[in-house]
Amino acid sequence: MSVKASINNSQEAVSRIAFRCSDALYVVHPNNSILNGALTESLKDLKKFETLNVSGKVPHVLPLKSHADPFAHIADAILAEEEVASTQPKQITSVVASADALFFATPHLYKLAHEPLVAHVAIESTEAFDFASVRDTGFVILFSGNRPGDSSEAALEDTLETASLAHRLALKLNTGVLHFYSPVYDTTAALENIETLPSKEDAQHARVAHIPIEEKQEDSEKEGNIKEAFVPPKFDQPERDAATSEYLESLSIKPFEYSGSDDATDVLLVFGSAASELAKAAVTSSVAVAIVRVLRPWLPSKLQEVLPTSTKRLTVLEPITSLPRKWDPLYLDVLSSFVASGSSIELFAVRYGLSSSEQATEIIKAVRDNLSGALKPSLVCDFTDGVSQVFVPTPPSIEEAYHKLLHRVFKSRLNIVNDPASSATKQNIPSRLIISPQFALGSVLEYENQRRAFCDEVATLLKEKNSSVSSESLEVLSNWIVSVDNLESPVDPELVISELKKDSSAPIKSLLDRSEFFTNVSHWIIGSDAWAYDLGNSALHQVLCLEKNVNLLIVDTQPYSTREAVRSSSRKKDIGLYAMNFGNAYVASTALYSSYTQLISALLEADKFKGPSVVLAYLPYHSADDDAITVLQETKKAVDIGYWPLYRWTPALEDGEYSDFKLDSERIRRELKTFLERDNYLTQLTLRVPSLARTLTQSFGAEVRHQQNVDSRNALNKLIEGLSGPPLTILFASDGGTAENVAKRLQNRASARGSKCKIMAMDDFPIEELGNEKNVVVLVSTAGQGEFPQNGREFWEAIKGADLNLSELKYGVFGFGDYEYWPRKEDKIYYNRPGKQLDARFVELGAAPLVTLGLGNDQDPDGWETAYNLWEPELWKALGLDNVEIDIDEPKPITNEDIKQASNFLRGTIFEGLADESTGALAESDCQLTKFHGIYMQDDRDIRDERKKQGLEPAYGFMIRARMPAGVCTPEQWIAMDDISTKWGNHTLKITTRQTFQWHGVLKKNLRNTIRNIVKVFLTTLGACGDVARNVTCSSTPNNETIHDQLFAVSKQISNELLPTTSSYHEIWIEDPETVEKRKVAGEAVQDVEPLYGPTYLPRKFKVGVAAPPYNDVDVYTNDVALIAIIENDKVLGFNVGIGGGMGTTHNNKKTYPRLATVVGYVLTDKIMEVVKAILIVQRDNGDRENRKHARLKYTVDTLGVSTFVEKVEEVLGYKFEEARDHPQFIKNHDDFEGWHKTEKNKYWRSIFVENGRIENNGILQFKTGLRELAERLYTEKSEAEFRLTANQHVILFNVAENELGWINEHMAKYKLDNNAFSGLRLSSAACVALPTCGLAMAESERYLPKLITKVEEIVYEAGLQKDSIVMRMTGCPNGCSRPWVAEIACVGKAPNTYNLMLGGGFYGQRLNKLYRSSVQEKEILNLLRPLIKRYALEREDGEHFGDWVIRAGIITAVENGGANGAVHEGVSPEAF
């Protein structure tokens, strides 16, 4: 195939460069036929010669129309691509266009400024483009082909080189570039130099610039052709400007170029579309001239460098624009720069306009002559004679068919309000305003107002019968005014004007001065199909709302054959349907090349209709060069297939009228008729009851008796209603259920008093019905930072902005809050804020209070009930129901203890709930029972509100947790766990802080399959949650296999013997449901029994942890029972026993607190099972079953006292504890990530870092796949290796043979499982799941902690502590799943983005931390930690850990006694609040 040898014009130059440097090239076809022809020919050549881009691929070429807001399409495409594929390489985009395409581009350019987008814009010398509209969009702006003295060949080469530079700049700095060039024709230049184009590597870097660095590194290794990952820098504007300047300077690019003598005193700074013509004229006239080559970034120092030192006066030449300005933008740039630098050069401003290149010499001469005179500084001169109008985008000639038809139909009556051609008659109005549909609508409204005033003036003249006006004139005016709005009137306006001209009176002359109002004009606003992409930004919506007599003709140009290419994000709205839904507009869908008659009828009907009219006109074409045959073919295809239906619709505007819809599409009408005939026929055939005549089925007597019964029933209802008390509507908003439960109780009490009462959530109540209510009571809780609960937010948003009259309404509000929840003074506004806001809003809307605002406070002696018990009697008094005697047996609230007692050993109605396919949820009481089965019901809180708006129930899913003592997992078990997550979960595995697995997002229908697969590999979920002994945690002790074997045996024994014995687990999850049903019918012969737990199990959960000093990787003291192994010569002799550890608390409730276990004695290994059971029995019999917040073992120990509790345990045992024995001091509570280690049995182990325990595949790492494949190979090769899950949410690969190290190392390197190159801070971190699945979460945790650590790492690196371990943990609520209370730094979630910052925990889990600052957000956290970490780095002693230092430095005081009896709340600095 032949090869292109040269470039012949600038259009070909920029299109070639853009093609070579892009993945997607948008070609905006200009209306200029010469420009468009050259561009089209260039694109054909690129296709003909099979040109490739720098990456060796053929880019996509997408044509756009210049008058249809092309940059809106481009911005949507780029931003939609980034949103959909945020972790995938993006396309590099370029644009070739002319200045008309930038007409409405400014708002879109702002969005694209940080994209590597290059737009090459052709601008003719006579084109008055307003550069001010794009100068501050953030784009780099370059000019080419404008150097003084350049020949055509040199100008073409300059354009070619600058186009290449623009792409290199965009890709290198990840910034948008506008390249303006002056078109050059009929010359020749060599093809582009490949060395000047961006490299393949530059292009790839730009494609992945938005992807996180870790993923790019992985992609780099996969690609094999990129040596190192590269991230284009992200700058704010000053930094971007500096980087651009530096890059331009490295390429020897001059932002300004000077031509003239070295001792010139007067210099012209030429800028704009005609800069090249003016520069040439200046050089010819021996006038010194400087040219702007780089407008943005503005580099004033470079300007002063090129100016001669002899310069005294600088004249800035800028193009004229249609917008009135005193000072032009470039002049102001130069002025501010010179003033800032203290320059003494005088400045002058000149505006020019060029209608032909010959005028350039005249303008330069005029400027020189003016400068030789005595001008004052800053004088503005205009040289604009003969200047062409500012460019206004106009539709191509192919769309003139509808224009011509309008002129033919309406002749002199036609007024196309936004016709660009009319700009010549509106000299004082900017052209861009004239074509704006909003301006056009305003013009019509103003015209109609003036015409109405004109008609009133005529009517007044006829009424007063002015003697100076002739009788003939009055008769003519009388005939005209009678039919002024009648389109069929026989009165000809031209004849009226002709007759009035015979009258010379002053009133008639005044009317003739406004003779245009005699004609009943038909106003038309013409728009393109671009309107259909955003109906709110066009005049369509305003026209429909204003209901004025305005006609819209909207031309749709999209061919049927290209409809699939339209992205969903840019899908057109149906304008016709939109307009018809308003019900006040005439709507027609027409196609000139399909039905000429239908179009004529639609135009006439639209003109006749007294109101807004919308006529959709179909004119499909691919490019402006398409002929009528192409349009005809596309039209026929679209109309025949039904893509473009033809119809007309006239609405009914008055009572008694009927709307008239005419379907003009023959094919659709024919098919619809066939369908309706068949449907009607089948309907008649399928009537369930024969339709017989009434005379055969009814009698008059029967009708009378029926009416008597109806009247009697209505009379009885009225009588009963008269006897009842006042109506009452109770609304509630509650996240935790408190307000809802109180509302239900209030409803029962109101009903018992005779009130006609109804109850519902606030969001379920239609706001517009408030005005019809008599009495409304609202019970509302407080969420987050004084926010409404989720089921009350829509109600509040609606009433907050509603314009209601509630003068007939009486209301009462009671709020539930906690005065100490936000202890800082500035945060007190959040206390009971929803209740206060509602009360104030009801008053604003005119409602009268039934009772004063009630504010429940959890800090009161009886909590919220203290205030409520005073508020409710006042409510009954206001309703007149206070003296009503009632005898109501209010059932006590159902507690967890009631649910357990009635559950028949954890059965409840779970079995029936699983069979209910109408919902994805289980009953509330069953959800309490499924916890004992290891299952939590959750929903996706990220989409909860959206689903509620859609009328859907929450996206329910279930979390399942396995019971896996000591976290030991075989390869076979790992494969099964992975299969479950893939088949039925959310494709991730979660390692918990209790050394087991969790699965999220399991649907109700998949619960049985999931649990059956868990059981198949000899695991269970029973007892993994609920008020029983949970999974037993145990130190991993990988260095000593002998010790771990002993500890693992103890852990398994404790786990198995504390496992509930109920058969409900097997019955519900394992057995076949049909078998269970049959057995129930036959009658249950065997009854369950729980010898250890009893029918109500424990008051709360019971946790056991086993540690082997010196490692406390399980944070043993945080468990209800802490077992610390006493080891001699690799033999576990026994255990020191600790009791009363626990993490869960409630914010600002000092009755709740974290506590560390108290060591009470020592027992031998063979007796440890007896001891654990005895402790459990004492807790079972003495724990608080009334208040679940006070039910954990730690509260039982503190309530009874440690000595009393121990006595009770010893009483159960029948013997006493021995004295606690000494053991090696604990040295740390986190995992070891220092590569492979060898055990005493010559096996190997190493830790695998899993951040926050989330095993998943993402765009950065494929951990899930890597660990799955590792497990598969270990299982296939029957390896003895196993996995151990750690309590810090990581994985230990253990028991690896030496001959397996080779392939395991390769595999781990392949999936980056061996990557432990993280800071000590990150390696020691942990987080709970929190949002979006955990129902208790108040703030983010797992998803946020890595981001926060990244920012804290910057502080750590600054202090030189990157290798030092600082234990940092985060939870989304105060329940403490990640054990934050023993971390050196902890963030405990309190509200969205808000945390309590805790400091001072023990490095190895031996000490609780304490509140340092309450209710802080990210910025405050970083500001607080920065000085502390810097001080720690400078002041610490050898081996001193951060938690120890903050206590020694007096930052906080140490928590005494392990936190017993709430010691963690003591000694908190007032500054914390």
Curated annotation (Swiss-Prot):
GO terms for molecular function: 4 iron, 4 sulfur cluster binding; FMN binding; heme binding; metal ion binding; sulfite reductase (NADPH) activity. The keyword Cell inner membrane does not apply. Transmembrane segments: none annotated. Its cofactor is siroheme; [4Fe-4S] cluster. [4Fe-4S] cluster binds at C1328, C1334, C1373, C1377. Residues 728-876 form the Flavodoxin-like domain. It holds the Pfam family Flavodoxin_1. Siroheme binds at C1377. It catalyses: hydrogen sulfide + 3 NADP(+) + 3 H2O = sulfite + 3 NADPH + 4 H(+). InterPro entries: Flavdoxin-like, Flavodoxin/NO_synth, Flavoprotein-like_sf, NiRdtase/SiRdtase_haem-b_fer, Nit/Sulf_reduc_fer-like_dom_sf, NO2/SO3_Rdtase_4Fe4S_dom, NO2/SO3_Rdtase_4Fe4S_prot, NO2/SO3_Rdtase_4Fe4S_sf. It is found in: Cytoplasm. Its EC number is 1.8.1.2. Pathway: Sulfur metabolism; hydrogen sulfide biosynthesis; hydrogen sulfide from sulfite (NADPH route): step 1/1. One of its GO terms (biological process) is sulfate assimilation. GO terms for cellular component: cytosol; sulfite reductase complex (NADPH). PANTHER family: SULFITE REDUCTASE [NADPH] SUBUNIT BETA, SULFITE REDUCTASE [NADPH] SUBUNIT BETA-RELATED. Catalyzes the reduction of sulfite to sulfide, one of several activities required for the biosynthesis of L-cysteine from sulfate. Belongs to the nitrite and sulfite reductase 4Fe-4S domain family. Alpha(2)-beta(2). The alpha component is a flavoprotein, the beta component is a hemoprotein. This is Sulfite reductase [NADPH] subunit beta. The gene is sir1.
